[in-house]
Structures are given as structure tokens and as C-alpha cells.
């Protein structure tokens, strides 16, 4: 049974049980900074497990089913080395928000597996939490699973989150029941007698049913108290690829129909069959290219931090394994269309965004292969500093791996060719230290249900989300509902206290969509607090970070909330950002997509997908288009509409962003260019007419990462100040060069030409100095040993470039081995004849350094370094020649 058929059978089955089928949510979590990527099927549905009403399509649905794409990188080093680990996977799930519970979840799971997938009931085993008698009895009495195939386990195996009772976290939790498939003795080990025993792969977990019925409270770590939840939920997860491997009767998911075509293509491209030791590299490439294509298709971009660093690491690991297969040129981008072909029917964004994704991957590959070349040079330098028989330290091998992406096995192979060993134990220790740091930093998966302050939960249950008034007003009267300081809820806050203030309604915009959070004042009789920024919770409760300056602020106080008037500048910049986006697409093409933004009062920053720097004329056209929009003074309107209607009208959505059923569409009613319009889904603050922006000037354009560019610009008074400052600097420069501003460019070109001429004269003088020194001897007489002519020359005052030139000249004059010294520097050059007699510059220099002090290295005909004692070097060199 093909993977696509299994996926459809599952979703159709639960639709028949009254579930709403939802499309997969983005891999990029929406409004959940605790997650780098969507890592579980339930992650996007977290608010509904915590009590939010599950409204979809205008009605409430208590039953939902999904096939969710997920990405996890916690065990990345095991990917490819085992048949159980992968990064990008699809999780089938059925969910109940306070509707059905254990009985239905268990009976439906059994029905689907045995009647619809036709799995042999005799090969299905189940496990339950040791204290969950209810689940045990359902399996035994209602389903009919024999007692010997029902295992009872503790909180580490059959409670979610694992170990939560003893170790936390606090919050919703519950027992779980897992379903395993017995693949037979051929897949196992003698000690494997059932699920969670032994070390083999005989018993494969295919489905986990989580019964979220308790609120865990208490010390962490320490024995927790399990309080029954008012709303009991069901959260299940079935690994699509594990089930596919069973139904397709293949040994692991790498041979299923969504993986194996990629592995076959890698084998074809490399000429290395999928077998033996190299099969690890085939699997790594197949897994990682799927993950990279999926993440980029959902809006991620390569970077040095956060999720961008994760996908960069995946791409580089795949490239390293390609290198081991002999693929030394960019090749991953050529696999992207195959990934889109295999997965694009269910994830259409992969096909829609394929051209941009291919381009990003190609650029990132080219950049990294240059880095890999740097790793080769670094490894050569490290090995050159070792004595014969020495071992490369593990920390250095790991630094090569971590900085240059240089795989350990490649380091071992190259070192062995040169006669050196590698401290692999030290490498593993350094790796484990980094993984420990990584696990500590990325403990978010365990905290997926981490609870906010109880007061916020109670406020939301009682009043709902904060009412936002800021689209139409910068001031409002409001009531203080709560004061929070850290984890504490306060009744009042005095002068100097920093608190998070919750109001019943607010004109303050909460940070989001690239726009910074509003700042300003809260005023009340006898008191004042300064709001530094504003954010909001997942549930839409606005948190005003404020410091009390005068008086005492109390819960229940009526305050006047006043947004700083600079918000108007923020509005100018936000509308200008929309115009910039449209202008970039008009000038550069429809491949341009927003990849990030910052909208502040004093500037705007816009990141967008484009493979190369903008030409000056392109920047000029973009800037002119935006200013024509401004001068036309078109109205700016916004209205709410269903998401599908907005898409049909052509409203631009953020690349990879997921939206609710009803969205706000911001539109500029007019255009300076036929066929060009600005219409975007946006919750931010905007001017009422484009003329309010005043003016728009681009300050800079630069690269952010491979395939992503950044423009910074200013509007309004900031644009005037920027223009005036630029003119003043131009005038000052012209005065300093004693020319008129109109003649400034001509004067600079003349100065640059004169500078180049002087540089040529300096180089000529250096060459003459070298010739004079050599002609004057410099100790550079030629001597002979074993048919090789050698010389040592001391030439004071030369830089490294001149030293190399001197060595070249000596070889051209007949020397086979030329050592040139200047101050603390040294260059060694060999003739083809010397190389033909078995000499290698790096090895000869290291041998010389052992006798004359100093360090250095090289390869082939050239080596360089420093610290050699000239007298000792002159005495030692002939003894090192054949």
C-alpha cells in the first residue's frame, strides 16, 4: 500500500467518525517562540488542549484529524546510522477537545489497524500506564487483546510528558497507551520478548494514544499532585513512515516509496550503489534534503541562528556525506524537484515554491563547498604541525567538524594517508559536550504544554482576549485587570517597580508581523507608569511592560493609556514596507517573497528572497515607484474577510505563515503602474493615505544569507534628515578636496588613478630591491648535493609577497631548493626536479623547523612559516636533501 493511500485512508476514516480534516500546519510555528519547528502533530493545536474554543470555518469542532509534517533534530547524529531515526516525518493524528475519551480512541485505533489496514491482530501488542486499569480493561475486555500481549509500564514509558509525575513539567498530562507491531524474530535480538525489552527492532511502535486527563502540580523535581482536568482530551500520533514500511514489507522506512526514489537518484548521481558502509551517506542525504526542501517551502531561510541554523546544518551534513560519495559539486538542488514530486500532492507549497527553494539551496551549497575547501586547508595546516606518528587532538578534529562541516571519517582518512592518527575518543567527548549544551538550550520539546501564569488563564476564561483599539485611537480609558512581576501576581506596584500590566482594552499595539510593540504612558490620579513595550500571549492577552514612575498602581485602577505619538512614524514605515514589497516584485519578479521585517518609528527593514545584489538602476526604480505611490496620495483601506476570499482576490500572504479563518486585508487603493497593486494580509498599523508617508529613501541594500537580501529605508522626517546629512557630507568632502560638488566624482577618479600608479611603483621598487639583494649575494650562492642545487638567502625588510617572489626568482636562476629568510619569516620553494626526486615542501620545512626552530607548513612546491634560526637552517638544510 502506497504512503499516499495510507494517509488518505486514515484521514477519511476519522472524517467518517465526525472529525474535521485540517490541512497540515506550517513547519514554522505560528506565535510559539518555544518551538523552532513544529515537532509533533498536536503542537499547532496546543491552545485547544488548554481550553480555547476550537473554531474552524465559523463553527466549533471538538474532533479534528490531521496529517502533520514535523521536524526534529535532537538525534541528528543517529540519522542514517539507524533505521529508526529521521528528521522530517509525517504524523497522523486524531484529536478530541473535551469530547470522546479512552474507549472510543482505543476501539477506533484497533478498527483502523485491523479492518482498514488489515494488519494481523496476532502481531499487535499494546502497552498501558501501570496504574491505568481503565485502559487495560478496554484492551483486554472490549478489544480482546490477550493479557500476555498487554504490557504495563511506568511513567517514563507510558505517561506524557515522560516522567512528568516525578520530574515535571507542571500542567496538562496523562497516561498513554502505545500500539506495537511485531515484525518477527528476524528483526530482533534474543533478549527482546516484547515491547520495551531488548535492543532489537522487532517490536515497532506505530501509534501512541495520549489520554490528557490530569493537571500535574507540585515541586520540580519532586512528587507531583495529579488533579483531574475539567476537560479531558485525546491526542494521538501514528508514524506514517513506520506503518508504510510494514505495509510495503520493507526492512525500514528508507525503502518506502517516499524515500527510496531519492536514495536511488543519489546512487545514480554518485555511481555508488546503496549497500555496505556508504549506505549511511545515502540515507543521510535522502532524509536531510527532504527536511531542507520542506522547511524552505514553509518560509524558513538559511542563517546562523535559530531555525535558519538548523536547516543550514542539515544541508551541510548532507553535502559532507555527498563528498564521501564523491559528489564534490553542488547536487542537492538537483534533488529538490524529486522531493516536490514525491510530496507535492499533499503539500502543494513544495511545488509552488520550488524555483525559489532550488535557488536558495544552490547558493547555500556553493557557499559551503567553499567553506569545505577552507576545512581542507585548515586540516593540512594542522597535520603539517604534527611530528611523524603523532595524533591529531580530538578537539581539533571536532572544531573542523563544527566550524567547517568536516566529517570525522574524512579527517581520519586524510590523516591516515599522511601517516597520522586522530583522537576519535577526544572527538566524541567534544561532541557530547556540545550535545549537552544543545539539549539544555533546546529543552522546549519537554515544555510543549508549559503553563503560563494561572492568573492569565483565569482572565482569559472570564473575559477572553484583550480588546485592541489602536487602529483608530492612540488614547483610551482602561481598567487594570492584573499586575504580573515574574511568576507573581501583584495587587499593587509602587514607584520603581517593573510589572506586566493587563488592561481590559488598549490602544497599544502588541509586537507582531515585524512591527515593534507600542510604548507610551499609563496615567491615573496621582500616578504614572511608563510603558516600554507591548506583547501578547498566544490567547491574545496584551502585556504592557511598564515601570511605575509615580504613585501606586493597583488592580482595578482606571487608567488613561497613551501611546507615544511616534507611533505615527511607525505607521508610515509599515505602509511603506508594503509598497516596497510590491515595488520589488514589480522590478525584480514574482519570486520575491518577504523573509522578515522590522517596522520601527525611525526606520524600516525588509528581508526578501532574491539571489543576487540589486543593481543601482534596480534600486533607483524601486525607490521611484514607492515615491510615486506616496505622491499620488492614494487611500489606504483595510477590511476583514474569510481567508479563502482574500486569497482569491490576490492578497499577498507572508511566505510560510498560517492564518485564521478570518483575516485582515490592507490595500492601497491605486497604483503608479498598470497591473501593480499592494494588497496584503496584515494585522499591523497603517496610515490612512499614502501621502502621509511624506518621502521614502533607501539607506542600504545587503545580503542577510544565501538567497536573502535586506533593504533598510527611512520615511517622513527621517528621510529628510538622511538626505540632508548625505548632502552635508558630500559638501564637506568637496571642500576638503578643494573642488566644487559637481567636479567631485572626476576628482576622486583622478586620485584613485594616481594611487594605483603609486602602488605599481612600490611593487616595482620591491622587485628591484629583491633583485638587488639577490644580485648582491644575500648569502644566496648556489651549492650542490646529490644533483640538487640549493641556497639560503637572507633578505631583510621584505614582506611575505616579496619573499615568495624572491624564492621564485632563485628557482628561475637555477636553484632546486631555495630558502628565503627575512626577519622572522621564511619561504621554501622547490623546483620540479626536486619534487621529481621525492621532496615535498611541507615535509621538508617541518623537518628543517625541528632542527632550526620555528613552525610552518605547506604542500607541493611551496611552504612558509617563521621563527627559523638562519645559521641553524643553513647548516641543517643540506643534511635533509637526498
Swiss-Prot record:
**UniProt subcellular location:** Cytoplasm
Where does this protein have compositionally biased stretches of type Gly residues? 854-868
UniProt free text on domains:
Consists of three domains; the N-terminal catalytic domain, the editing domain and the C-terminal C-Ala domain. The editing domain removes incorrectly charged amino acids, while the C-Ala domain, along with tRNA(Ala), serves as a bridge to cooperatively bring together the editing and aminoacylation centers thus stimulating deacylation of misacylated tRNAs.
Q: Which UniProt keywords apply?
A: Aminoacyl-tRNA synthetase, ATP-binding, Cytoplasm, Ligase, Metal-binding, Nucleotide-binding, Protein biosynthesis, RNA-binding, tRNA-binding, Zinc
Q: What is this protein called?
A: Alanine--tRNA ligase
Catalyses which reaction? Answer: tRNA(Ala) + L-alanine + ATP = L-alanyl-tRNA(Ala) + AMP + diphosphate
Q: Which InterPro entries match?
A: aa-tRNA-synth_II/BPL/LPL, Ala-tRNA-lgiase_IIc, Ala-tRNA-ligase_IIc_anticod-bd, Ala-tRNA-synth_IIc_core, Ala-tRNA-synth_IIc_N, Ala-tRNA_ligase, Ala_tRNA_ligase_euk/bac, DHHA1_dom
Q: Give the top-rank taxon of the lineage listed in the UniProt record for this protein.
A: Bacteria
Q: Recall the taxonomic lineage recorded for the source organism.
A: Bacteria, Thermotogati, Deinococcota, Deinococci, Thermales
Identify the stretch(es) annotated as Disordered.
853-882
From what organism does this protein derive? Thermus thermophilus (strain ATCC BAA-163 / DSM 7039 / HB27)
Q: What is its main location?
A: cytoplasm
Instruction: Cite the HAMAP family for this sequence.
Output: Ala_tRNA_synth_B (MF_00036_B)
Homology family: Belongs to the class-II aminoacyl-tRNA synthetase family.
Amino acid at each position: 500500500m502506497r504512503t499516499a493511500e495510507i494517509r488518505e485512508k486514515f484521514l477519511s476514516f476519522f472524517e467518517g467518525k465526525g472529525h474535521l480534516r485540517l490541512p497540515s500546519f506550517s513547519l514554522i510555528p505560528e506565535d510559539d517562540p518555544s518551538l523552532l519547528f513544529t515537532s509533533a502533530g498536536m503542537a499547532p493545536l496546543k491552545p485547544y488542549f488548554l481550553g480555547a474554543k476550537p473554531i474552524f470555518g465559523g463553527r466549533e469542532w471538538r474532533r479534528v484529524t490531521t496529517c502533520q509534517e514535523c521536524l526534529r533534530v535532537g538525534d541528528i547524529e543517529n540519522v542514517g546510522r539507524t533505521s529508526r531515526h529521521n528528521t522530517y516525518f509525517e504524523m497522523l493524528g486524531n484529536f478530541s477537545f473535551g469530547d470522546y475519551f479512552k474507549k472510543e480512541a482505543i476501539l477506533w485505533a484497533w478498527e483502523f489497524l485491523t479492518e482498514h489496514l488489515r494488519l494481523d491482530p496476532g502481531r499487535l501488542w499494546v502497552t498501558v500506564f501501570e496504574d491505568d486499569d481503565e485502559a487495560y480493561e478496554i484492551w483486554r475486555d472490549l478489544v480482546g487483546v490477550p493479557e500476555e500481549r498487554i504490557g504495563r509500564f511506568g511513567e517514563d514509558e507510558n505517561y506524557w510528558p515522560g516522567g512528568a509525575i516525578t520530574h515535571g513539567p507542571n500542567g496538562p498530562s496523562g497516561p498513554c497507551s502505545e500500539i506495537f507491531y511485531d515484525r518477527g524474530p528476524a528483526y530482533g535480538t534474543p533478549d527482546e520478548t516484547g515491547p520495551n525489552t531488548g535492543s532489537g527492532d522487532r517490536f515497532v511502535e506505530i501509534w501512541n494514544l495520549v489520554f490528557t486527563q490530569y493537571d500535574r502540580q507540585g515541586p520540580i523535581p519532586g512528587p507531583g499532585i495529579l488533579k483531574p482536568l475539567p476537560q479531558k482530551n485525546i491526542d494521538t500520533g501514528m508514524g506514517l513512515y513506520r506503518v508504510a514500511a510494514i505495509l510495503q514489507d520493507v526492512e525500514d522506512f528508507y525503502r518506502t516509496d517516499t524515500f527510496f526514489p531519492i536514495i536511488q537518484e543519489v546512487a545514480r548521481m554518485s555511481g555508488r550503489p546503496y549497500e555496505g558502509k556508504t549506505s549511511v551517506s545515502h540515507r543521510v542525504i535522502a532524509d536531510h534534503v527532504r527536511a531542507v526542501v520542506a522547511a524552505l517551502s514553509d518560509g524558513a531561510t538559511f542563517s546562523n541562528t535559530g531555525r535558519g541554523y538548523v536547516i543550514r546544518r542539515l544541508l551541510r551534513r548532507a553535502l559532507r556525506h555527498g563528498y564521501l560519495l564523491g559528489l564534490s559539486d553542488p547536487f542537492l538542488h538537483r534533488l529538490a524537484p524529486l522531493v516536490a514530486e514525491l510530496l507535492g500532492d499533499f503539500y502543494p507549497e513544495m511545488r509552488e515554491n520550488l524555483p525559489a527553494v532550488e535557488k536558495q539551496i544552490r547558493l547555500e551549497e556553493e557557499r559551503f563547498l567553499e567553506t569545505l575547501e577552507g576545512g581542507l586547508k585548515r586540516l593540512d595546516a594542522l597535520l603539517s604541525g604534527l611530528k611523524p606518528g603523532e595524533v591529531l587532538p580530538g578537539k581539533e578534529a571536532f572544531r573542523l567538524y563544527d566550524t567547517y562541516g568536516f566529517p570525522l571519517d574524512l579527517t581520519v582518512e586524510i590523516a591516515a594517508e599522511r601517516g597520522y592518527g586522530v583522537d576519535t575518543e577526544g572527538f566524541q567527548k567534544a561532541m557530547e559536550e556540545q550535545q549537552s549544551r544543545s539539549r539544555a538550550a533546546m529543552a522546549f520539546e519537554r515544555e510543549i504544554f508549559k503553563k503560563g501564569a494561572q492568573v492569565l488563564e483565569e482572565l482569559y476564561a472570564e473575559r477572553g482576549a484583550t480588546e485592541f483599539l489602536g487602529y483608530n485611537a492612540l488614547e483610551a480609558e482602561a481598567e487594570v485587570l492584573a499586575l504580573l512581576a515574574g511568576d507573581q501576581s501583584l495587587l499593587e506596584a509602587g514607584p520603581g517597580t517593573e510589572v506586566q500590566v493587563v488592561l481590559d482594552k488598549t490602544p497599544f499595539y502588541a509586537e507582531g508581523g515585524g512591527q515593534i510593540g507600542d510604548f507610551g504612558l499609563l496615567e491615573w490620579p496621582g500616578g504614572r507608569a511608563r510603558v516600554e513595550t507591548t506583547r501578547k500571549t498566544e490567547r491574545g492577552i496584551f502585556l504592557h511592560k511598564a515601570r511605575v514612575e509615580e504613585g501606586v498602581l493597583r488592580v482595578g485602577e482606571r487608567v488613561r493609556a497613551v501611546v507615544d505619538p511616534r507611533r505615527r512614524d511607525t505607521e508610515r514605515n509599515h505602509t511603506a514596507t508594503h509598497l516596497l514589497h510590491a515595488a520589488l516584485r514589480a522590478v525584480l519578479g514574482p519570486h520575491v517573497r518577504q523573509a522578515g521585517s522590522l517596522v520601527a518609528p525611525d526606520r524600516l527593514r525588509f528581508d526578501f528572497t532574491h539571489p543576487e545584489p540589486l543593481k543601482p538602476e534596480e534600486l533607483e526604480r524601486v525607490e521611484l515607484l514607492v515615491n510615486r505611490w506616496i505622491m499620488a496620495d492614494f487611500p489606504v483601506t483595510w477590511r476583514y474577510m474569510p481567508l479563502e476570499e482574500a486569497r482569491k482576490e490576490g492578497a499577498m500572504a507572508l511566505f510560510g505563515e498560517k492564518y485564521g479563518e478570518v483575516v485582515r486585508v490592507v490595500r492601497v487603493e491605486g497604483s503608479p503602474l498598470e497591473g501593480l497593486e499592494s494588497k496584503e494580509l496584515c494585522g499591523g498599523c497603517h496610515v490612512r493615505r499614502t501621502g502621509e508617508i511624506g518621502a521614502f529613501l533607501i539607506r542600504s541594500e545587503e545580503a542577510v544569507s544565501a538567497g536573502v537580501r535586506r533593504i533598510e529605508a527611512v520615511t517622513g522626517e527621517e528621510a529628510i534628515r538622511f538626505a540632508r546629512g548625505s548632502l552635508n557630507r558630500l559638501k564637506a568632502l568637496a571642500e576638503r578636496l578643494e573642488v566644487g560638488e559637481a567636479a567631485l566624482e572626476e576628482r576622486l577618479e583622478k586620485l584613485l588613478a594616481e594611487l594605483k600608479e603609486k602602488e605599481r611603483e612600490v611593487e616595482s621598487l620591491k622587485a628591484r630591491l629583491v633583485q638587488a639583494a639577490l644580485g648582491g649575494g644575500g648569502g644566496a650562492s648556489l651549492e650542490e648535493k646529490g644533483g640538487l642545487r640549493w641556497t639560503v638567502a637572507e633578505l631583510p625588510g621584505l614582506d611575505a609577497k616579496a619573499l615568495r617572489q624572491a624564492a621564485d626568482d632563485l628557482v628561475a636562476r637555477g636553484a632546486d631548493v631555495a630558502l628565503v629568510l627575512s626577519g622572522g619569516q621564511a619561504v621554501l620553494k622547490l623546483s620540479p626536479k626536486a619534487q621529481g626526486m621525492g621532496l615535498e615542501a611541507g615535509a621538508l620545512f617541518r623537518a628543517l623547523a625541528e632542527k632550526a626552530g620555528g613552525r610552518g607548513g605547506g604542500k607541493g612546491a611551496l611552504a612558509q612559516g617563521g621563527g627559523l634560526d638562519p645559521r641553524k637552517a643553513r647548516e641543517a638544510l643540506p643534511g635533509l636533501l637526498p
